[in-house]
Amino acid sequence: MIEIKNLTKVYKLNKKQMKESKTKSNRKVAVDHLSLNAHKGEIYGLLGPNGAGKTTTLRCIATIIKPTEGEVKVAGHDVVTEAEQVRKSIGFLTSDIKLDPQFTPDYMFEFFGRLHGVSKEVLKERKEQLFEYFGIKDFAHKQIKELSTGMKQKAA
């Protein structure tokens, strides 16, 4: 379950950003007191025009950025005080994927597994499971720059 209570995210603007935004305020409210409960099995879509705060909301849920105010919980874990637990429960994938074009999906999986202290045995077993599940085996050793957008999303 995802619980959001009065989520607010305010960005501070520098002078250049204020000029570009044609504003005298040094604050930009990206999300303003959003509340939402998403229960297990439910599917939600965040709809709105550019600048409405959709991506900012998702980044707060995924612990990529911290809320200015409010509370966000994922599976009962607070995104600020229990970020590690939250990240074990969810993933976040944007349409703008930033992967090193020289890497392969196989290399990335090994690299991040080792980075998080996963043993070789567990890493091998988990990689086999996930590559099979997501259909990555056929392109596991191709460089990211050779992959289609869909393949990149699977690798990410």
Residue positions per predicted region:
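Conserved ABC ATPase "signature" region
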Residues: 110, 114, 121-139
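Conserved ABC transporter NBD signature motif
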Residues: 70-81, 85-86, 90
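Conserved ABC ATPase signature
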Residues: 143-150
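Helix-to-loop junction immediately C-terminal to a conserved catalytic motif
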Residues: 62
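Walker A (P-loop) phosphate-binding loop of ABC-type ATPase nucleotide-binding domains
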Residues: 49-53
